Amino acid sequence: MASFVDEVLIRVSSGRGGNGCVAFRREKYVPRGGPAGGDGGRGGDVVFQVRRNMRTLVHLRYGRVFRAKNGQDGEGARRFGAKGHDCVIPLPPGCLLRDAQTHEVLHDFGHAHEGCVTLLSGGRGGWGNYHFRGPVQQAPQRAHSGQPGQERVVHVELRIVADVGFVGLPNAGKSSLLNFFTHARSRVAPYPFTTRIPYLGVLRTGDGRDVILADVPGILERASQGVGLGLRFLKHLTRCAGLAFLIDLADERALHTYDLLCKELYAFSPVFETKARVLVGTKLDLPNARECLQQLRAQHPSTEVCGVSVHNRWGLDELQEAFVRLSDAGAGALRSPVWRNQAPSFMYAQLEDPVCQVRDDFGATVSLSRKRKVRG
């Protein structure tokens, strides 16, 4: 089975700013060159970048400490130190960043066109002694230390971004439908929980459009309380533009399956109540399936109901059109309830977090009494 990691804890820290330099201008025929100490370079930032070709967080499982480079110290002749290299952490689309201590939402990559975000800024470089020159103090022998970097423990949670998410009991035909439309090679077998991790596939329509389909493991009764695979994979459906409820028409519980699935989804998150949906009756080629499909349509007259058979290729064209309509219903919407309800205020709240507070020694001066080398 392919490795699928959707949650991981990582420690990130930005770079420290370089120290300012104590130096003086020493040139021929310039007896009083004055101070010429350069400023320290700024520390590197911690940047999270979305990459569309990634689907899991397995690359963060074994390397969980990420540090940006420190800024270089200033030098003589007013030469500034180089900025430290940024630490760029690649992420798949749909990730949610939380503070591991306060559980504050730091950033939510639920937006469809989001690229990268700077989570921690590097420390500022210290001033060289050139900044302390004046008519009274013409040869200052002090410089500022660089600002220390910031550090945080971040909980990274992946929530798959898709246009249509498949919801159903085990063995409802979700994987077979995904394989037919997208050639995703999801495993199919006649026993429950054949699908144990989410699978994504791209449905390419005749007019050149792409519709992303997501298949998650089957949902059991009381799944919102931890039964079966429980809550672990229900979160991946929160970002889907629409939901396809797959109902096995040969199951004796078929007429009650939709209510059961809705109950579990609503108990997990109220965001599911407003999502566009379509009911898909599967295994239409089995006995008594058509009668069950008619009863299902009578029970839910306000919801679109489709009947399909992957084995006989029945009703698949109509279902493809329904998937396109679901994708259009959520087009342009921000598929993240966390981002809508919570403003991205972490950039302004950093100094209030004890982890990110500036230390007391920032701005301290360094004199020659500390045996600091003077550069000419």
Curated annotation (Swiss-Prot):
Per its UniProt record, what HAMAP family does this chain match? Answer: GTPase_Obg
Write out the similarity annotation. Belongs to the TRAFAC class OBG-HflX-like GTPase superfamily. OBG GTPase family.
Pfam families the UniProt entry points to: GTP1_OBG, MMR_HSR1
Q: Which residues form the OBG-type G domain?
A: 162-328
GO CC term (a single one): cytoplasm
Supply the source organism for this entry.
Answer: Treponema pallidum (strain Nichols)
**Binding sites annotated in the UniProt record for GTP:** 168-175, 193-197, 215-218, 282-285, 309-311
- Chain positions recorded as Mg(2+) binding sites: 175, 195
This entry's Enzyme Commission designation comes to: 3.6.5.-
Name the job this protein performs: An essential GTPase which binds GTP, GDP and possibly (p)ppGpp with moderate affinity, with high nucleotide exchange rates and a fairly low GTP hydrolysis rate. Plays a role in control of the cell cycle, stress response, ribosome biogenesis and in those bacteria that undergo differentiation, in morphogenesis control.
Q: Which cysteines are joined by disulfide bonds?
A: none
Q: Which GO terms describe its molecular function?
A: GTP binding; GTPase activity; magnesium ion binding
Query: Which enzyme type, at the first EC level?
Result: hydrolase
Signal peptide range equals none
Question: Protein name, please?
Answer: GTPase Obg
Cofactor names from the entry are: Mg(2+)
Q: Is this entry keyworded GTP-binding?
A: yes
Q: How does it assemble?
A: Monomer.
- Tell me which domain of life the UniProt entry assigns to the organism this sequence originates from: Bacteria
Cell compartments where the protein resides: Cytoplasm
Q: Which residues form the Obg domain?
A: 2-161
